Each structure stands twice: as structure tokens, then as C-alpha cells.
Amino acid sequence: MTLDGFTHEHPYRSSFGFLLVVVAVVLAVGLIGERFLMGSLVQVAVVDLALAIIGIFLLARLGWWGKAGYTTGIRLAHVPLFILPIAVGLVSLGQGIRVTAPLVVLSFAGLTLLVGFAEETFFRGLILTALLPAGTIGAVVLSSFLFAAPHLLNVIGGTWDPAFTLVDSVAAFGLGITFAAIRLRTGSIWPLVGIHALFDFTSLVALGGVEVPAQSPQVLLASVVIGIVFVLYGLFLLRKELITATPDANT
């Protein structure tokens, strides 16, 4: 049986297998980083470079470049779909900008593009595509849950405040719903790579790094609200699929 055939027959095993690759890389680099005293940003770069390479290899083996949205460009008619996530992605700049040195800003931009490519390759490219044979709505929800779960790893080593880590995972679940919906509506993964990079870039220049200290109750609540908004927006984009999936009460 080919790898593509296996993923089609076993969507859940395949999706969890892809997730295990992500978790294994994150934990392995974390252990190596502690031993060799890697900085947090270096660890992020190493993790996502490894995931990007592995993701490209898997896409090539599966022959999923088209199915995962890499061969479809961005249509002008789809641009309005991106307005809400882009606007939310810019919210971090309301806290101020701590990083202004041109070389640092450029390095952050390069790093976040790498992160966007690597994470979208796994979660909206490999995992979402693997789950689609089991049903569109189920694939969107489960892939979003699997996207949110690894965010909990940010609490390891004290990189993120525990309370913020929890609410950020809620926001990540909502963002996953919206991203999956956009991926299915547009047929392209490229807008998500850019928007994902925007979220991470604005956070980096606002915080000055990847460490997140304790946040105010207002910020924590806002993160939960953002997650809920993204869930609703994503489901709105998928309303036709929701109607199709709902049995007719008269039948």
C-alpha cells in the first residue's frame, strides 16, 4: 500500500502520526537546546526548519502539492475573507513596538515566514488533508484541536506564563477553525502562510522575543473572546458544508 493510500484508509492514524512528528521535533530540539544552551529564538528556528524539511519530504512522497493547496494562487475575490484574521493579527502592535532595529526586524520577518510555512504545511496541509475523507466539518474541528494542543508545550521551561498558555490554546483552536475554512474556501494554503507569519511577527516585535510573561485578566479574556470569534467566523465560512451535513428533519 502506498503512503497516500494508507492516509486515505486511515485518516485518524495518519493525522495523529503527523502530530507526533511535530511533538517529537519540538521535544527533541528542546532537550538539545537545554544541553547546548540554545536561545529560545534559535530553538524556534531549528524546530521550524526541521518541520519545513520534513513537511516538504512528506508532501513530495504523498504527491499532495495540489491537494494541500500549494499549486493554487490567491484570487482577488477571496481577499475579503482575509480581512478579519489580518486585523486581529495586527492587534499585538497595540501594546507598542519593542524592536525597531532593521536587521532584527528582518530576521523576525524571515523567522516568522519559516514558522508560517512549517506549521501550515503540517496542520492545514498534511493533517487537514488527511482528515478530509472522514468528513469536512470533522476534519476542520479535529485538525484545529490538533493545532491547539502543541501550544500547551510553550509552558515547558517557563517560556510562557501558564495562564496565557491555556487561553492561547483556546485562541489557537479558533484560529485553526478559521484557517481551515479559508483553506477549503480558497483552495490555497499560501494566504494562511502569510497570515500565520503576520500573527507571529507582530507578537515578536511587540514582545521583543518569544517569552510571554504573566498577562492581565483583560488580556486573558480577550484571547478567549478572539478564539470564540474565530470559531464563529470559520463556521460561517463553512455554512454550506454545515447545511449539507445536517440531516433533513422531514426525511
Model regions and ranges:
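Membrane-interface helix/loop boundary segments of multi-pass membrane proteins
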Residues: 118-144, 158, 184-188
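Cytoplasmic-side transmembrane-helix entry/capping segments in multi-pass membrane proteins
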Residues: 72-81, 107, 132-142, 191, ...
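Alpha-helical transmembrane segments in multi-pass membrane proteins
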Residues: 11-60, 75-83, 102, 106-107, ...
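C-terminal membrane module of polytopic membrane proteins
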Residues: 39, 197-251
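Membrane-interface helix caps and helix-loop-helix hairpins in membrane proteins
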Residues: 36-39, 92-103, 158-162, 210-217
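Functionally important transmembrane alpha-helices
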Residues: 165-221
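Short, Lys/Arg-rich, polar N-terminal cytosolic tail immediately upstream
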Residues: 1-11, 66-67
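Membrane-embedded alpha-helical segments in integral membrane proteins
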Residues: 21-38, 86-96, 148-152, 200
